[in-house]
Amino acid sequence: MKINSTRSVRAWLVAAIASLALAACATGPTVRTDYDPTANFAQYRTWGWYSPIAMEQSGYSSWISERIKANVQREMEARGYRFDAKSPDLKVNFQAAVQERSSVYSMPRSDIAWAYSYRARSYVAVPVWYDEAVVNNYTEGTLTIDLVDAAKNRLVWTGDAIGRIGSRRTPEERAVDIDQSVAGIFAKYPYQAGSGQPLPIPR
């Protein structure tokens, strides 16, 4: 029981920490998408949940996963997809992950060097300019939403919301982060239910 409990807590923390990152920047998270070019999106009219949801593999849900579900449902219904728990055309899965990263950049610095001047017959101060390498370590969080062809159990579309984990945020702030991240991912999804013609995606 102790091992299972530890894994469950760890899984919940991964989800919670990842949600902190998704609106850390003023411009919101970076969104990346990919899709199966052979998929016929015109055949998809209904949707349901993949089982088990990747974020809920610990055996229970959290307020974070429930919040994501509510947002996904709103986005799918807004595109005309009808929920079908028994036999959907598309199954939706989602997960969160964190990763330690680092970035290196140059910072201009100045210092004073002393050089002997034969004209002044003394040592004089000489300014010296140089670039100093600065390493910035940070934690990156990712929320991934997958759309899976239910008949083939094949991934046909995926979207990632990626951002840095910032300072400690309240549950209310994290809820807003989740809303914005899911909306940002689906803003890049170009299809409506029953249509294989992609709509223009805002840049």
Residue ranges and their predicted role:
Residues 48-105:
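N-terminal segment of the mature soluble domain
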Residues 10, 60-61, 138, 170:
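A generic structural signal for short
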Residues 30, 79, 94-154, 199:
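Surface-exposed short loop/turn segments
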Residues 21-24:
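C-terminal motif of bacterial Sec signal peptides marking the signal peptidase cleavage site
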Residues 41-45, 83-88, 147-154:
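A short, structured loop/turn motif at beta-sheet edges
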Residues 2-14:
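Bacterial N-terminal signal peptides that target proteins for export
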Residues 26-38, 132-203:
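C-terminal/domain-edge helix-coil "capping" segments
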